[in-house]
Amino acid sequence: MRNRYSGLLAIVLTSSICANAQSIDGKVMENDSIPVPYATVSLLQASDSAYVAGVIGGEDGSFSFDTNSSGKIVKVSCIGYKTVFLPAAAHMTIHLLPSEQALQGVTVTASRPSFKMEQGQFVTHIQGTVFSQLGLATDVLQQLPLIDTDGIKVLGRGVPLVYINNKRMRNWNELTRIPSNMIKDVKIDMNPGAKYGSSVRAVLYITTIKPVGEGLGGSLILSENVSSCWNTTGWLDLNYRRRGLDFFVNTSANTFSNSHYKRQDVYDFQYKGQDIHADYSGDGYNSAKTGFVSVGVNDQLTDRQSLGATYTFSRVFSNSADQNYRNHVWQNGAFSEFDTRSTQSSQNGNHNVSAYYENKFSDKFSLNVDATYAHNRANSRQIVVENRMDNRSMLVPATKSESDMVAQRTVFTSTVANGKLDYGLVTSWTRFQQQYCIENEDYSGLLKTNDNESKQSAAHVFANYSRSFGRWFTQLGLKYEYIDYKYYAAGKLRDESKRTFRNLLPSVSLSYSQDRFSLMLSYNIYTNSSSYSQLDDGLQYISDFRYNKGNSQLQPTKKHSVAFNASYRDLLLICNYSYGKDAVVSCFDVMDEIPAVLSYGVNHSFSSVYTGLSYSPTFFKIWRPSWHVWIHKQWLSYNGMEYGRPQAGLQWKNLVVLPRQWYIVLNASGNLKGHSNTYMAQSSINVGMSIQKNMKNLWVKLAASNLFNAKEKGYSEYNGVYTSHWVDNRQPSISLTISYSFNPAKSKYKGKTAGEDELRRL
């Protein structure tokens, strides 16, 4: 009896100690002196073995969880060792025994939902799951619910802002330099609130795991792609960390970027009472050489203070496009044909300098300051030669553009009434200049030399408050925005294009979560300004049958958006209704001077709705499919024409996990015929697949994209004008990618990049 009570007392004391532990840490060892590196450590609920969290152990066998140990079990597995289950404790030393028979490279991880909603954000945990073995961040994103198969768009919201460890991503190539096994989690915020730019409709947060050890680390990636042409790309990343100081260098080069495509365009319109049908078809060839380098430093001054700076330079060293077309024209029953050859060469260079300072004064108050300067310069020269039966003509248009942008962003974060208050100031100044000229002196057509410049000063102050009430979470935001825009033609201020805007932009959201069931309702007002090239009034040559002109008097679009999201287990429903006041509509009209059409943009208000349903289960522990069905409907009428045909689509993603660390990905996406703005997109389907083998610090992937060579095709109809295009990109393309990493250590740079809206417009 005494032994029974003693045992019961020991259990009670052990449970009490575990309940008081607020964190769990330990090491995985083979014996007292040999650690087991990179073991899979999972935290489970003791009551039902439900998955709580997971990590990959360090090279020294260490692991940790930021949660208490009460009522939890630690599961540890590693290739070549027996899997063990132990009660969780604050400090653990776990010894693994070699398995009697190796598991042939099979790593079993707990089944978990693909996503869940936490405080209004959709969260997908990557660390310790099969997603962490897919290669690169781009490969992970392509397989996640709510993300398009191209990995760069949020379904129903478009291209998001991306933050990597709280650092604003400047170049999409950065995603190709993050190994998937370094990603802790991915969060999608579809209600960013007032603290971001006025046009931001979604924010993607990628958090990487804390690197193990110090010293020099890096990765090298080489990729070879072939379709009808060859394409060679390479990336090299180096990172040196010593205590709190962190130096990093990221580089990439695309030395042989070539492509070949076939294109056909058709135009039907009336010119001065005569019916005109014109088309051209032929081949195009592109070739480019590009490079990118980014260097930076981060200094963790104390546990609460850090600062850093980054310089990034990207350049298109050469970009040439060669097009050969056969033109056919029927004008009032008379037929003619001629040949056109267009040769275009271009270059550009971009400089970006950013710096940040972060100070967590206390647990209830912090400061983050960012500053950014960006300078861009580009030039292009085109030679267009026409060979007709009776003559030969030449056109040599050239374009030069230059821009500068300076911005700062100051954000304070305070704890107020058990909630979080973000408030601050963002300012920016932007200059964009574009020159367009015709270099051949014998030209006597419509195109004129023009030199136009845009200047804008902008500022906004914001406050964003968020708080949890049990299972409820609410967010309230308010932003005041001031914009002063000026447009200059040939150095003279255009009064009719000068304007000042003052906008008050609210945002509100309410969400509810219980276990694996979540709801969210939100309302936001967004503003979106046209790109600076869209605001340029200069006339530009596209083809013999088409010219383009900007519109300096375009107003910013103010979009009212109401969104509803719901999730239950592996099901997710997203609905979004938006009304765009002064939205930009693409239009065509017949020119007065010559038989050709002119494309331009105008402001016109209309509404739209997007609804999508996703299902992302796991079957047989090795197959992770994801289906997403969506429909988009707009109510757009302009100039007597209706553009309201709904468009529906489907995405089907598949990830299959095989023994010996082999992975197969098969993704398909397609859409039915329907309107997007004034453009009627035709039905299409795109299928891609890959097979990958992982080997410690090395992985190899063989992939094929656009297996059935889906064509780009569609048309637009206006009053008296019909245009269509068809593009064959000569695919599928086959690629081989090899990646090697050593002592991986991702940078801790925490800058968020001020002026993200202006960088997008430029």
For the regions a protein language model found, what residue spans apply to each?
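Short, acidic, small-residue-rich periplasmic hinge/interaction motif at the N-terminus
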Residues: 42-44, 77-81, 91-130, 149-150, ...
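A short, solvent-exposed loop/turn motif at the edges and junctions
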Residues: 44-50, 73-86
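Short, acidic Ser/Thr/Gly-rich low-complexity loop/linker segments typical of extracellular
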Residues: 47-62
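N-terminal periplasmic accessory domains that precede
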Residues: 90-97, 109, 137-140, 172, ...
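Extracytoplasmic beta-strand/coil segments of soluble accessory domains associated
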Residues: 138-170
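Short acidic/polar hinge/loop motifs at secondary-structure boundaries
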Residues: 168-193
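Face-selective signature of the C-terminal outer-membrane beta-barrel domain
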Residues: 290-318, 341-490, 511-520, 570-575, ...
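Outer-membrane beta-barrel signature, preferentially recognizing the C-terminal barrel domain
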Residues: 453-456, 496-499, 527-581, 597-609, ...
